[in-house]
């Protein structure tokens, strides 16, 4: 609106009198159109955010109705932000790849859960297998890593889990398709990852080494909050030298800390003290998280997964959850910034 005032002043002093009224009239029409488009954009954004909140509430509601905790899939909240709320390309993926990657990763995680391999070997095999699947499908849907590692880190799973992830993935892509049909978001064609297979394999090996070391230390000290799957996804995202997230490490750390606090707030305060059902508690937590995102002007998908996690975590050490999430976030970001930098070309100093 300030721009409109300045243009009106320009019209008053510099536009000839005979053209002035016509100029001002056109200016008012254009400003009204811009304001209307802006309001429409805000309305569409609010609808997309509301859809994520409804997905989270539906997920918890179905889990309670069926008595199957496996239907609470924290990464679905993160995926919903990337696939429904954010209009630009977040991951190199399309709908069928989304379903295949998430379902395949969940099935692999369940198989590893029932295997007799040591914990660290399960994590390493799960991480490397999903990384290979991402390479084969030329995709960058890194939240698939979380689908595989979640039952291993939490040490809880059943054969219902891959079925639940499959159904939730169908729900996600179905809502994305519907939003595109309703013009609430623009359809984006699939664009494969630009890196060569060799480059991606080398990078996956380096990532695997770091993840294995951190997992080994966390397992030794029995502090599994340090290696929650959304944190590993965060590390993989941050390890990309071209990622815009690398420009705001402090903000991302704060968002993860706030998300962890909100998750605990919902589970430990809204439900027992205010008497809210888990469904309403989940909706309230996601609503508050979107307020934080809007205030910070940054949507960060893994933070949504962190906010959902307390719904399925054992609450014996609830006070450690936000502390360890914050420390692990800072650690993973520091490692990514220090050891995963862009290669310098010959013309650079």
Predicted feature residues:
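Alpha-helical transmembrane segments and their membrane-interface boundaries
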Residues: 6-103, 107, 111, 115, ...
């Amino acid at each position: 609106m300030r721009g409109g005032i300045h243009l009106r002043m320009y019209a008053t002093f510099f536009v000839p009198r005979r053209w002035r009224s016509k100029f001002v009239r056109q200016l008012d029409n254009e400003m009204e159109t811009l304001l209307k488009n802006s309001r429409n954009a805000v309305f569409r954004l609010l609808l997309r955010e509301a859809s994520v909140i409804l997905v989270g509430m539906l997920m918890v509601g179905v889990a309670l109705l069926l008595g199957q905790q496996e239907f609470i899939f924290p990464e679905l909240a993160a995926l919903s932000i990337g696939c429904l709320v954010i209009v630009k390309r977040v991951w190199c993926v399309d709908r069928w790849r989304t379903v295949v990657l998430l379902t395949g990763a969940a099935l692999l995680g369940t198989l590893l859960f029932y295997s007799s391999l040591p914990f660290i070997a399960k994590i390493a095999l799960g991480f490397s297998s999903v990384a290979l699947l991402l390479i084969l499908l030329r995709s960058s849907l890194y939240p698939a890593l979380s689908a595989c590692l979640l039952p291993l880190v939490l040490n809880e799973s059943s054969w219902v889990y891959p079925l639940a992830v499959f159904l939730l993935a169908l729900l996600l892509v179905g809502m994305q398709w519907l939003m595109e049909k309703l013009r609430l978001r623009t359809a984006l064609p699939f664009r494969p990852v630009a890196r060569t297979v060799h480059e991606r394999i080398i990078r996956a090996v380096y990532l695997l080494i770091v993840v294995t070391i951190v997992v080994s230390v966390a397992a030794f000290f029995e502090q599994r909050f340090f290696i929650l799957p959304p944190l590993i996804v965060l590390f993989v995202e941050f390890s990309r030298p071209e990622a815009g997230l690398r420009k705001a490490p402090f903000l991302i750390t704060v968002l993860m800390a706030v998300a962890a606090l909100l998750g605990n707030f919902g589970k430990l305060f809204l439900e027992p003290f205010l008497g809210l059902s888990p469904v309403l508690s989940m909706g309230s937590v996601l609503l508050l998280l979107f307020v934080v995102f809007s205030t910070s002007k940054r949507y960060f998908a893994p933070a949504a997964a962190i906010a959902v996690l307390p719904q399925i975590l054992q609450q014996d050490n609830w006070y450690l959850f936000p502390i360890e999430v914050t420390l692990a976030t800072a650690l993973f970001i520091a490692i990514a910034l220090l050891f995963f930098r862009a290669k310098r070309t010959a013309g650079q100093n």
